A protein has these predicted regions:
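Conserved glycine-rich cofactor-binding loop
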Residues: 9-10
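Conserved glycine-rich Rossmann-like NAD(P)H-binding loop of the short-chain dehydrogenase/reductase
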Residues: 23-40
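Rossmann-fold cofactor-recognition segment
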Residues: 44-61
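Catalytic Tyr-X3-Lys loop
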Residues: 86, 97-113, 128, 132, ...
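Active-site loop immediately N-terminal to the catalytic Tyr-X3-Lys motif
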Residues: 93, 143-147, 190
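Active-site helix of classical SDR
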Residues: 116, 152
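Residue(s) in the substrate-gating loop at a strand-loop-helix junction
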Residues: 136
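SDR active-site lid
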Residues: 164-190
């Protein structure tokens, strides 16, 4: 059983990596900070079985190189989880916040598509696999000062719903997880 997880250095991604390792999966851990990924891997069952890929999910070539390396070693994974995400308080009235809004969408939405893309063809060939997008209940209701995060998670919900329809006859499942508040390093900053 193999699992590829972005955002694996902390929060939901790290927790899922540990949970899957406990159940015997081989896990590919993706995050920007190699040293933090190594700490996560050290806490996992059978750390030598898991792969580390230091990559920024907003840099497609880095992400696709990680995906190709995982596929070359383990084949198409059983599960791909796009858990990388950021949240920055934003107010649209402030010009400088427009760049923050763009960065939130690049990480939370566009990187999810980039995460899933390299796995679709091999999963189709295998006629199995699951693509999992981490959304949020914040994608259902907007919150003042959180418009970038809320809108990005609403986009994730719609994107995954659309992708589910696109892949419905392929053997690939597309799942959306919309957790409520979870105490993570991300939420601690908000």
């Amino acid at each position: 059983f193999t699992v590829f997880i972005t955002g694996a250095s902390s929060g939901i991604g790290a927790a899922l990596a540990q949970e899957y390792a406990q159940k015997g999966a081989v896990v590919g851990l993706v995050g920007r900070r190699r040293e933090v990924l190594e700490e996560v891997r050290a806490r996992m069952n059978h750390p030598q079985n898991h792969e580390i890929y230091a990559a920024d999910v907003t840099v497609e070539t880095e992400l696709h190189d990680a995906a190709r390396a995982f596929i070359a070693k383990h084949g198409a994974p059983d599960v791909v989880i796009a858990a990388a995400g950021i949240s920055v308080g934003t107010w649209t009235e402030y010009y400088e916040d427009l760049a923050h809004i763009r960065r939130v969408f690049e990480t939370n939405v566009f990187a999810m598509a980039s995460t899933f893309h390299p796995f679709i063809a091999p999963m189709k060939a295998a006629r199995k696999g699951a693509l999992v997008g981490i959304a949020s209940v914040a994608g259902i209701r907007g919150l003042p000062g959180s418009e970038a995060y809320c809108a990005s998670k609403a986009a994730v919900i719609s994107y995954c719903e659309s992708l589910r329809g696109e892949l419905r006859d392929s053997g690939i499942s597309v799942l959306t997880i919309s957790p409520g508040y979870v105490a993570t390093p991300l939420t601690a900053k908000n």
